[in-house]
Curated annotation (Swiss-Prot):
Residues 5-69 form the J domain. It comes from Acholeplasma laidlawii. CXXCXGXG motif repeats lie at residues 144-151, 161-168, 187-194, 201-208. Keywords: Chaperone, Cytoplasm, DNA replication, Metal-binding, Repeat, Stress response, Zinc, Zinc-finger. A zinc finger (CR-type) spans 131-213. The J domain is necessary and sufficient to stimulate DnaK ATPase activity. Zinc center 1 plays an important role in the autonomous, DnaK-independent chaperone activity of DnaJ. Zinc center 2 is essential for interaction with DnaK and for DnaJ activity. The lineage of its organism: Bacteria, Bacillati, Mycoplasmatota, Mollicutes, Acholeplasmatales. This is Chaperone protein DnaJ. It is found in: Cytoplasm.
Length: 369
């Protein structure tokens, strides 16, 4: 099967800028990452997106592709990606792919932005429907305070890489059916940094990064529900060499309530009433998420009838619209009657006999006519 055009894979035009290419890749990589997507062919699509990005994000490879198509990139026009993608890690791994792993110095520089982090938070039902504030502690990585991310013990220990001369990449010539073609690869000596280090920082052991904790008061909006995700800007991993931090994404799990249930932004409550209340009607106090309110039970109500309390639901966090509370009436049949109660029901049954007979006749008519 012929390979798809890389521009079509990313959904961009041939005149797309580097920022537009990166934005399209990031969106599609999030959508099709196997750890996130439930689509059956997510892994195949993810590899296809990764392959397209690897070519279009490299100026030399992009130029060859624009001239010669898939053959110009060293890829089989009818096969899979030449190098493959290997295994898949967690979601943090794909976030790092959004900014890292490029083949040029310009691409390497964009990797300075901190990675996004993801966490799950369990909250109570009432916290979810009314909103709350949670103090969150996040484990992050950030630039070492001693070496400021360089990985060197001092500035004197940093030297321009002798292999790539500070470019972070080297040129590699390959023979193809169209002749010798030149591509760029990350410098193996400096790993794309453009510099080498004599003495490593004693604090971070040359990594340039250290572990740390961040705390933040997260305002949970009223109306959040299971699997909803909240973005907290700037509380992901710290950026490299002064770049901005990534973001924190919190996905919620809401504990069930003893009496309340949810249907979107509406609250559902089952309320038991007696035969007497159902027949004669009544006024009863009903709990809502905002406190008790008085509810009128109309005379003659049937079991399963749903009564509405306007604007007594939770808010929709996206629109701000408030839902309603739906009260479902359940008529309880009395058990273990006293002798006096039995006599009263027998008297009621005698008074109700003509109506009961009429109803039974109507019921039988459905089968006899």
């Amino acid at each position: 099967m012929a390979k798809r055009d890389y521009y079509d894979v990313l959904g961009i035009s041939k005149s797309a800028s580097q920022d537009e290419i990166k934005k399209a890749y990031r969106s599609l990589a999030k959508k099709y990452h196997p750890d996130v997507s439930k689509e059956k062919d997510a892994e195949t699509k993810f590899k296809e997106v990764q392959e397209a990005y690897d070519v279009l994000n490299d100026s030399n490879k992009k130029a060859q592709y624009d001239r010669f198509g898939h053959a110009g990139t060293g890829q089989d026009p009818f096969g899979g990606a030449g190098g493959g993608f290997g295994g898949f890690g967690g979601f943090d791994d794909i976030i790092s792919q959004f900014f890292g792993g490029g083949q040029t110095r310009r691409t390497r520089q964009t990797s300075n932005v901190g990675e996004d982090l993801n966490m799950r938070m369990t909250i109570d039902f009432m916290e979810a429907v009314l909103g709350t504030t949670k103090n969150v502690s996040v484990d992050i990585t950030q630039d070492c305070g001693h070496c400021h991310g360089s990985g060197a013990e001092s500035s004197k220990d940093v030297h321009t890489c002798s292999k790539c001369h500070g470019q972070g990449f080297i040129n590699v010539d390959q023979r193809t059916m169209f002749g010798t073609m030149r591509s760029q690869q990350v410098c193996p000596q400096c790993q794309g940094e453009g510099q080498t280090i004599d003495n490593k920082c004693h604090v971070c052991s040359g990594a340039g990064r250290v572990k740390a904790k961040k705390t933040v008061d997260v305002k949970v909006p009223a109306g959040v529900d299971n699997e909803m995700t909240l973005r907290v800007p700037g509380y992901g991993n710290g950026g490299r060499k002064g770049a901005e931090s990534g973001d924190l994404y919190i996905t919620f799990r809401v504990k069930p309530h003893k009496i309340f249930k949810r249907r979107g932004s509406d609250i559902i409550l089952d309320v038991p009433i007696t035969f007497t209340q159902a027949a004669l009607g009544d006024k009863i106090d009903i709990p809502t998420i905002y406190g008790e309110v008085e509810l009128t039970i109309p005379a003659g109500i049937q079991s399963g009838t749903e009564l509405k309390l306007k604007n007594k639901g939770t808010k929709d966090p996206r629109t701000g619209k408030t839902g309603d509370q739906h009260v479902i009436v359940n008529i309880e049949t009395p058990k273990n009657l006293s002798s006096e109660e039995k006599k009263l029901f027998e008297q009621l049954s005698k008074l109700d006999s003509p109506r009961k007979k009429s109803g039974w006749d109507k019921f039988k008519s459905f089968f006899t006519n």
